[in-house]
């Protein structure tokens, strides 16, 4: 680190002075001034990272503890892309004296694989961009002065695993009502198992759709601000993914685990499930006891409109009669109104549309009745809008083709993003924590080791050693801290 600062004192400051001089001559060129400062600061940062990593590698080479078990093979170059740019440094390959296996011990201490080219900060930046824009754009924004390929972005996404639910909180919330909204996004696939295996249907459309399921839990709705007409969900939490076949039960188990860990379910009077009545959604009632299904307002009004759109000036009266039959009548009363509407149909297509719409409401009869009767506690369903914002805006609103794995991982990542997840923490969740030798963190360096390190620094720095009056204790601390990691090898 000292060498980088020395170099900056000798050349970097002069460059900054020239940049400032240029700005003073032409104050209107603010952009060049800012860019120039930025470039010099980034260059200093990359030099500091390079020197620090090489110092760590040198500590490994000089370590008496390392020499007991590992011997030096050779020194190789290494490139790591950080969020600042690409750092080029040297690291040493060692061979274990007993097993004869080779390893880059610096990589072990840093917690990175030998072939890894991205640091965790760069990978976090990559995910922050990929969750909102394209793979290509994410690759361009990974680093300030460098980029990675869109293939690298895809590979990182496909290898993601997502953290398990956090442990039960000591104090659970006590609420009277909870709400679960559920719907799905229809995402286009490039292929099912391999390229070229998509089937074309009778209508000449490719059968290339996969469902990205979305479920979210919330406590109710409230105005965005005291005088606002817009509303927002209270403490929403999102779950998303493909969850095909038997995995659908896993989705609902995750929802239940969240409810059980965050709420005192014994004090909850009702849990409302707002949805369109899809099979995968209704199966959630088998995994979470006490759920009350409610037909979402969008689909209810959609099918009421289909049944009455041909009546022209009598639309409102017919729709009111249908709603009254659902709210206060029986299925027979509703079917009677449907039959009268079919008599007024002018074409077979209209009659068929009325029949299908009526059958949909009858198949979700109880859910539709609760929607119209229990207006005080039942909240409007925003599933369609949330699918658009949470999933479609990234996955299907524009012409895109995905792999099945890509759909599942991106859906999970979008839910993680909307839950306020930290991408850096997600990256760290992927890493295997390396074992540390017992007692290594308490290992005390000998006076001889400390003095040898200080003499080495003094010879290397020469006259500059006196210019940084606090550096001795700081360097000793760094040596001691890093030595504990060497003992853990």
Task: Give residue spans per PLM region.
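Short acidic, Pro/Gly- and aromatic-enriched capping/linker segments at domain boundaries
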Residues: 61-80, 368, 374
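Short, flexible, mixed-charge glycine/proline-rich loop motifs
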Residues: 71-72, 85-90
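N-terminal accessory alpha/beta regions
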Residues: 42, 46-69
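Short Cys/His-rich metal-coordination motifs, predominantly Zn2+-binding knuckles/fingers
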Residues: 66, 83, 97-101
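Catalytic center-proximal scaffold of phosphoryl-transfer enzymes
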Residues: 1-51, 94-489
């Amino acid at each position: 680190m000292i060498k980088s600062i020395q170099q900056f004192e000798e050349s970097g400051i002069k460059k900054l002075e020239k940049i400032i001089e240029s700005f003073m001559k032409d104050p209107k060129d603010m952009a060049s001034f800012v860019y120039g400062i930025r470039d010099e600061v980034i260059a200093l940062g990359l030099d500091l990272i390079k020197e620090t990593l090489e110092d760590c590698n040198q500590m490994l080479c000089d370590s008496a503890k390392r020499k007991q078990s590992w011997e030096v093979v050779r020194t190789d170059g290494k490139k790591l892309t950080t969020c600042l740019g690409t750092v080029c440094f040297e690291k040493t390959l060692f061979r274990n004296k007993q097993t004869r296996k080779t390893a880059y011990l610096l990589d072990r201490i840093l917690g990175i694989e030998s072939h890894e080219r991205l640091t965790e900060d760069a990978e976090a930046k990559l995910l922050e961009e990929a969750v909102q824009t394209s793979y290509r754009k994410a690759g361009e924004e990974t680093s300030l002065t460098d980029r990675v390929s869109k293939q690298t972005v895809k590979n990182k996404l496909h290898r993601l695993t997502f953290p398990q639910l956090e442990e039960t909180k000591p104090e659970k919330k006590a609420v009277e009502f909870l709400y679960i909204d559920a719907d799905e996004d229809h995402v286009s696939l490039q292929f099912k198992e391999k390229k070229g295996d998509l089937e074309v249907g009778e209508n000449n459309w490719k059968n290339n759709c996969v469902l990205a399921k979305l479920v979210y839990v919330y406590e109710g709705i409230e105005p965005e601000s005291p005088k606002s007409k817009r509303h927002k969900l209270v403490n929403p939490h999102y779950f998303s993914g493909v969850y095909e076949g038997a995995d659908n039960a896993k989705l609902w188990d995750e929802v239940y685990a969240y409810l059980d860990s965050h709420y005192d379910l014994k004090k909850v009077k009702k849990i409302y499930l707002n949805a369109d009545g899809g099979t995968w959604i209704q199966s959630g009632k088998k995994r979470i006891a006490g759920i009350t299904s409610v037909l979402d307002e969008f689909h209810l009004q959609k099918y009421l409109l289909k049944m009455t759109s041909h009546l022209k000036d009598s639309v409102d009266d017919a729709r009111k009669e249908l709603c009254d039959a659902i709210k206060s009548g029986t299925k027979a009363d509703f079917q009677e109104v449907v039959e009268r509407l079919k008599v007024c149909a002018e074409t077979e297509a209209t009659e068929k549309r009325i029949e299908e719409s009526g059958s949909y409401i009858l198949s979700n009869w109880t859910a539709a009745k609760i929607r119209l009767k229990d207006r005080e506690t039942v909240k409007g369903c925003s599933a369609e809008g949330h699918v658009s914002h949470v999933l479609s805006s990234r996955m299907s609103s524009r012409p895109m083709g995905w792999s099945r794995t890509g759909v599942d991982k991106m859906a999970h990542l979008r839910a993680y993003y909307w839950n306020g997840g930290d991408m850096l923490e997600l990256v760290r969740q992927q890493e295997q924590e390396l074992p540390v030798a017992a007692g290594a963190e308490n290992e005390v360096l000998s006076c001889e080791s400390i003095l040898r390190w200080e003499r080495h620094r003094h010879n290397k720095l020469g006259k500059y050693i006196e210019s940084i009056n606090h550096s001795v204790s700081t360097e000793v601390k760094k040596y001691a801290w890093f030595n504990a990691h060497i003992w853990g090898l």
